[in-house]
Amino acid sequence: MAPKSSSSGSKKKSSASSNSADAKASKFKLPAEFITRPHPSKDHGKETCTAYIHPNVLSSLEINPGSFCTVGKIGENGILVIARAGDEEVHPVNVITLSTTIRSVGNLILGDRLELKKAQVQPPYATKVTVGSLQGYNILECMEEKVIQKLLDDSGVIMPGMIFQNLKTKAGDESIDVVITDASDDSLPDVSQLDLNMDDMYGGLDNLFYLSPPFIFRKGSTHITFSKETQANRKYNLPEPLSYAAVGGLDKEIESLKSAIEIPLHQPTLFSSFGVSPPRGILLHGPPGTGKTMLLRVVANTSNAHVLTINGPSIVSKYLGETEAALRDIFNEARKYQPSIIFIDEIDSIAPNRANDDSGEVESRVVATLLTLMDGMGAAGKVVVIAATNRPNSVDPALRRPGRFDQEVEIGIPDVDARFDILTKQFSRMSSDRHVLDSEAIKYIASKTHGYVGADLTALCRESVMKTIQRGLGTDANIDKFSLKVTLKDVESAMVDIRPSAMREIFLEMPKVYWSDIGGQEELKTKMKEMIQLPLEASETFARLGISAPKGVLLYGPPGCSKTLTAKALATESGINFLAVKGPEIFNKYVGESERAIREIFRKARSAAPSIIFFDEIDALSPDRDGSSTSAANHVLTSLLNEIDGVEELKGVVIVAATNRPDEIDAALLRPGRLDRHIYVGPPDVNARLEILKKCTKKFNTEESGVDLHELADRTEGYSGAEVVLLCQEAGLAAIMEDLDVAKVELRHFEKAFKGIARGITPEMLSYYEEFALRSGSSS
């Protein structure tokens, strides 16, 4: 029998190898997301718009090398790029490399997660492209037109928002950043004027709605124009480039972060030459909305580092060990793609204090893993961990020691200068012809937005625009949208709806009571303005003269004499953040909860400073410790004393307390430095009673009925303000009971009301308050 031919054997081998290749291809798993990494070659030239992708990924998505595809953040519009196959042996499967120029279009930073799609159609040829510079220079004075032409020709694909960085000028002694501000094709409709029912020659609107519309540059056919614009046309609605200049009110914090991040990332050997390891961790803490996350994005954009974000809840898994594995994967990626920054948002949620009762086994394992990973980063590595929290005391103390989170940077609530800076930057983003706010108007807004954080001010600007639009639509449905402008009145109207974040947890309706609503008591009103409004509104003058403002004011007097009403009017008229505290809400049956409630009230007041804390019936909260007060009441009083005048100074917060039993308040609370000023709010005099009667009877038609209000004012001698109001209400009720359609209230109705009202203020009561005034010696 003849032997088998070798050709038959080779066919079998060939078939086997083919099947092996097919099996290998079928086993390939397409990544769910891709990681942004920098371009392997220089950013300018023929590689500007190329994206290097693993060959197997291109095969799976049926994208041919050299054809168009789109990359973009997951769930967002993409950017058109030219696909190139990376080295199969070297290029990671889940990585897409992009040039700085392409990343600038979508504000992409290294480490961003991307999705990849095949482009359905070829972009149109551009008939016109407009070029500007980030510095606002006249480009033709700095560079030759042929240099720009070659730059765009090499790029091939152009789109608004592309930034070509660090281009040498004619002189060669400096560089500029060139930006494409606009591009168009005469055969296509203007992007800003597109109608949702329109279709176009390139395959429908879906193909036009990239993040930025792409065009092909054709040398000799595409006309180049030059502009002094510093950014892409607003009609494209591109993400705004993040830079330190865009952040308002955080100059000190920015300088601190720049030194703490950039040197360890890019020059860690400087530290090792001194025999010390560079700082590895930074803890940003401060109230929500102050700009912690925004600050990180700016640092990430400017430092050109690989950024990984850990959001507490997103990595927590119900399965044992998965959370720790996710943390290890993130730190491994950071070590692989150095220099890198790991940002942990809300770190208190994944690494709480292990000493807390509510901290379980899972939290303890996560904290232990995080400690191990931070210790294992090594002295020479270029990895920095930045964490953010608004509850720094809830973070495990082992993380806050040097060697882990070496530095702690507080991002506090902005002061008036910082608010002015933030508002100026916010309104500068609007076109100058869309608002009529000058520098003085913005200063006025900044002075009135006490306790507002950056996020609140952004919301205020947005709400102001809403008010402007509503005002325009209310007057004329066909109004020209370009004639609408944001005014100071719109901003003031928006301030009613947008409250400071620190005050949002306090469900307190701002009382709409004005000084004019309080009959008489002119001396009391003047004293309250002098002692409370003036120090808060003119704090700089007080500091310059070395005068300390009163810490607190005690309003005491008989019941019904407008003590609480005065506090409400003060809150409304001053425009200052107002916190009202009711005694029964403070006391809690659980040990320590009442004291915690007091601390929380003062914390909120400090956050929203300048502010007023109003304690109504304060004698219930601070009974005399020499009397029959309980242990719980003593603990609350001690907390109150410490908060008002303890080790931590109370700045920008004034205490207003009201009581009708001043001698039952503990003496320690009444001393100077706490409730320094005592104001007696006595029964209204004849003029004050007349004012109250006029306010309460203005709809009684007393002129027709012949009721003499002066006589009624004399007859109500010794009545409290509340009793005078009750007299009017009872008289009105008597008139209605006589006739449901009554038009006027007559004297007989008042006579009937007098019979049902007894004076609540006795001579003994008045002498009691006089004795207290003599004993305290600080009545005003």
From Swiss-Prot:
BP GO annotations: protein hexamerization; response to xenobiotic stimulus; ribosomal large subunit biogenesis
EC number(s) per entry: 3.6.4.10
Regulation: The hexamer is activated by RLP24 during pre-60S ribosomal particle maturation; RLP24 activates ATPase activity of both ATP-binding regions and increases cooperativity between AFG2 subunits. The second ATP-binding region is inhibited by diazaborine; the inhibition requires prior ATP binding specifically to the second ATP-binding region.
Catalytic reaction list: ATP + H2O = ADP + phosphate + H(+)
UniProt feature, compositional bias: Low complexity: 1-23
Any single Pfam family the record assigns to this protein: AAA_lid_3
Alphabetical keyword list: ATP-binding, Chaperone, Cytoplasm, Hydrolase, Nucleotide-binding, Repeat, Ribosome biogenesis
Region of interest: Disordered: 1-26
Residues the entry annotates as binding ATP 1: G286, P287, P288, G289, T290, G291, K292, T293
Family annotation (PROSITE patterns): AAA
Keyword Electron transport: no
InterPro entries referenced in this protein's UniProt entry, alphabetically: AAA+_ATPase, AAA_ATPase_domain, AAA_lid_3, ATPase_AAA_core, ATPase_AAA_CS, P-loop_NTPase
A GO cellular component annotation in the UniProt record: cytoplasm
Disulfide bonds: none
UniProt note: domains: The first ATP-binding region binds ATP with low affinity whereas the second ATP-binding region binds ATP with high affinity. ATP hydrolysis mediated by the second ATP binding region releases RLP24 from pre-60S ribosomal particles whereas the ATP hydrolysis mediated by the first ATP binding region is subsequently required for RLP24 dissociation from AFG2, probably by disassembling AFG2 into monomers.
Function (record text): ATP-dependent chaperone which uses the energy provided by ATP hydrolysis to generate mechanical force to disassemble protein complexes. Plays an essential role in the cytoplasmic maturation steps of pre-60S ribosomal particles by promoting the release of shuttling protein RLP24 from the pre-ribosomal particles. This step facilitates the subsequent release of other shuttling proteins such as NOG1 and allows the transition of the pre-ribosomal particles to later maturation forms that bind REI1. Essential for viability.
Family: Belongs to the AAA ATPase family. AFG2 subfamily.
Oligomer status and interactors: Homohexamer; ATP binding induces oligomerization. Forms a ring-shaped particle of about 12 nm diameter, that displays 6-fold radial symmetry. Associates with cytoplasmic pre-60S ribosomal particles containing ARX1, ALB1, RLP24 and NOG1. Binds to pre-60S ribosomal particles soon after their export from the nucleus and is released before REI1 and LSG1 are incorporated into the particles. Hexameric form interacts with RLP24 (via C-terminal); the interaction recruits AFG2 to pre-60S ribosomal particles and promotes AFG2 ATPase activity and RLP24 release from pre-60S ribosomal particles.
Note: Present with 799 molecules/cell in log phase SD medium.
Identification of the protein by name: ATPase family gene 2 protein
